[in-house]
């Protein structure tokens, strides 16, 4: 039996800045850290949390849309996460704006560990009309 997709179709006009998503929790394992380090070819890489796209995971669980193009992303890393600790990610709509007739949303996500240590903050600007990419060059 097919799974029902109960996500909401994104209505950019109705989207509210400040909307907070359900918290996402996961256990960061040593295997996750090792896989990340292998992927970035750095045996001492400290922030595997950025590899999981936890900043937009909860948005994607709530909304469906035509896709997006990352316009800008900022990662602020504070304390390296520790294997075996449970991480909680809180994400929200931080902003939305119209630029050159195109709709953008800004999601912000903060990760903390089970001890309350701030791990990272990720701010992502997304163009919510991916079909617009390349039009200025005749694409």
Residue spans of the language-model regions?
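Hot-dog-fold acyl-thioester-processing enzymes
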Residues: 1-72, 133-139
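Short glycine/proline-centered loop/turn elements that form peptide/ligand docking sites
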Residues: 55-57, 72-80, 87
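Well-ordered beta-strand positions in beta-sheet-rich domains
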Residues: 25, 74, 121-125
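HotDog/MaoC-like acyl-thioester-processing domains
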Residues: 2-4, 81-139
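Short structured motifs
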Residues: 8, 71-78, 92-93
